[in-house]
């Protein structure tokens, strides 16, 4: 983790907007969808890039791992890549709770600013199912994909 350890607790609402800015710095132009139904789970954030869908689960300092196993299973059916974004409370142990192909981003408060650290970049998700992935897209998104690929 980076910077000075701080005992200030970060909540989901404190993390989201700065996270979107951080992801845009890394990936360039992105589209963000929040609270997207993903099978039997609800993805906190779905990041759409020109070539992939990313499922992003936020575990703030106030969260527990209670639902994480089921969330991982569901995310792995739908997304090309997955991230878990964790507060400092979870940073030391999160890798024990997500597969090796999941990316891990830590977040902490440093001198009053939200600071992110890429602990591990995601690898391509081996469990993604194309039919599941397509099922979460809305009609306008599917039409756009068809247009990009010269399909009627």
Can you say where each PLM-predicted feature lies in the sequence?
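Positively charged, polar, low-complexity stretches
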Residues: 21, 30-31, 43-48, 104-111, ...
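Conserved catalytic cores of phosphodiester-cleaving nucleases, focusing on short active-site segments
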Residues: 19, 45-47, 52-61
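Acidic-basic catalytic patches of nuclease active cores, encompassing PD-(D/E)XK
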Residues: 2-32
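A conserved mid-domain beta-alpha-beta active-site/ligand-binding segment of alpha/beta enzyme cores
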Residues: 113-152
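Catalytic cores of nucleic-acid endonucleases
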Residues: 63-106
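Short, solvent-exposed loop/turn elements at beta->coil junctions and helix N-caps
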Residues: 33-38, 92
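Short N-terminal edge-element motif at the start of the domain
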Residues: 23, 38, 43-44, 52, ...
């Amino acid at each position: 983790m980076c910077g000075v350890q701080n005992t200030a607790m970060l909540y989901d609402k404190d993390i989201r907007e700065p996270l979107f800015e951080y992801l845009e710095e890394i990936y360039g132009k992105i589209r963000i969808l929040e609270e997207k139904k993903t099978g039997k789970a609800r993805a906190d954030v779905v990041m759409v890039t020109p070539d992939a869908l990313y499922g992003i689960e936020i575990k703030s300092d106030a969260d527990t791992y209670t639902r994480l196993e089921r969330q991982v299973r569901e995310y792995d059916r739908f997304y090309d890549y997955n991230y878990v974004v964790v507060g400092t409370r979870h940073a030391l142990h999160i890798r024990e709770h997500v597969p090796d192909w999941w990316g891990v981003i830590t977040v902490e408060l440093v001198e009053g600013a939200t600071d992110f650290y890429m602990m591990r970049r995601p690898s391509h998700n081996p469990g993604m199912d194309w039919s599941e992935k397509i099922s979460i897209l809305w009609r306008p998104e599917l039409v756009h994909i068809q247009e990009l690929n010269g399909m009627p």
